[in-house]
Curated annotation (Swiss-Prot):
It holds the Pfam family LysC. Component of the spanin complex that disrupts the host outer membrane and participates in cell lysis during virus exit. The spanin complex conducts the final step in host lysis by disrupting the outer membrane after holin and endolysin action have permeabilized the inner membrane and degraded the host peptidoglycans. Host outer membrane disruption is possibly due to local fusion between the inner and outer membrane performed by the spanin complex. NCBIfam families: P2_Rz1 (NF038368). Transmembrane segments: none annotated. It is a lipid-anchor. It comes from the Viruses. This is Probable spanin, outer lipoprotein subunit. The lineage of its organism: Viruses, Duplodnaviria, Heunggongvirae, Uroviricota, Caudoviricetes. Keywords: Coiled coil, Cytolysis, Host cell lysis by virus, Host cell outer membrane, Host membrane, Lipoprotein, Membrane, Signal, Viral release from host cell. Interacts (via C-terminus) with the spanin inner membrane subunit (via C-terminus). Part of the spanin complex which spans the entire periplasmic space. The spanin complex is composed of spanin inner membrane subunit and spanin outer membrane subunit. GO terms for biological process: killing of cells of another organism. Residues 1-24 form the signal peptide. Residues 54-78 form a coiled coil.
């Protein structure tokens, strides 16, 4: 006796649907953490064309100030990202 193809397909579909009726623990609710950190912007470095030692000294001070401003921007963004990471990990630790 030969089984028709559509009958086998219908039976397999029913078996697959029955497997989906088993009880399983509910999936944890995903935690959405918005990225509220400021955007990274370029850190402009001042150009220089020193003619005297005094000009060179002034250029060095300008460069040091520009680097300090850039470092403070990077530090602020790093701190913001660390806070976001901590908020993301908190619900996962509380679920245990």
């Amino acid at each position: 006796m030969r089984t028709k193809i559509f009958a086998a397909g219908t039976v397999l579909t029913c078996l697959m649907l029955c497997a989906g009726c088993t009880s399983a623990p509910p999936a944890p609710t995903p935690v959405i953490v918005p990225n509220a950190c400021p955007k990274v912007s370029l850190c402009p470095m001042p150009g220089s064309d020193p003619q005297t030692n005094g000009d060179l000294s002034a250029d060095i001070r300008q460069l040091e100030n520009a680097l300090a401003r850039c470092a403070s921007q990077v530090k602020m963004i790093k701190h913001c990202q660390d806070e976001n990471d901590a908020q993301t990990r908190q619900p996962a630790q509380g679920a245990d």
